[in-house]
UniProtKB/Swiss-Prot annotation:
One of its GO terms (molecular function) is RNA binding. HAMAP family: NusB. GO terms for biological process: DNA-templated transcription termination; transcription antitermination. Involved in transcription antitermination. Required for transcription of ribosomal RNA (rRNA) genes. Binds specifically to the boxA antiterminator sequence of the ribosomal RNA (rrn) operons. This is Transcription antitermination protein NusB. It holds the Pfam family NusB. The keyword Transcription applies. The gene is nusB. Gene3D superfamilies: NusB-like. It comes from Pseudothermotoga lettingae (strain ATCC BAA-301 / DSM 14385 / NBRC 107922 / TMO) (Thermotoga lettingae).
Length: 140
């Protein structure tokens, strides 16, 4: 697993645990940061988590617009957490190609989700990318 893959896995766990345990972001983030030995990874995890929660209303709105016959709250906690992470990356991390974001999200869905999670996540994120990803990301 690459450093960035590991980082995404840990960010997913922060998002998931925050909702599952209903702890503060700071508490969950602190717990997760103890796992990481790399200063760079800690900085990336912190940037992602802060970025996700600072932009959560916009992220959730864009996900919701790409769901067909579903509401965001009806999604499993795993799928919702993955979609939030990947949507943040699609919209706000300009150096990450769209294909990498989708591939990494699918891998997290295969690891933690249900049998159908990876296909569902891929389909929703494809719509998010086509509808909302910055134009310059399409050429990375």
């Amino acid at each position: 697993m690459t450093r960035r893959s590991k980082m995404r896995d840990l960010v997913f766990k922060v998002i998931f645990q925050n909702e599952f345990r209903n702890d503060s972001i700071e508490t969950v983030l602190e717990d997760i940061l103890h796992i990481s030995k790399s200063g760079l990874m800690k900085a990336d995890i912190t940037r992602y988590v802060k970025g996700i929660y600072e932009n959560l209303p916009s992220i959730d709105e864009k996900i919701s617009l790409c769901l067909e016959n579903w509401s965001l709250q009806r999604l499993s906690l795993v799928d919702r957490s993955i979609l939030r992470l990947a949507t943040y990356e699609l919209l706000y991390e300009s150096d990450v190609p769209i294909e990498v974001t989708l591939d990494e999200a699918v891998e997290i869905a295969k690891k933690y989700g249900t049998e159908n999670s990876s296909k569902f996540v891929n389909g929703v994120l494809d719509k998010v990318a086509k509808s909302f990803a910055p134009e310059e990301k399409r050429y990375i």
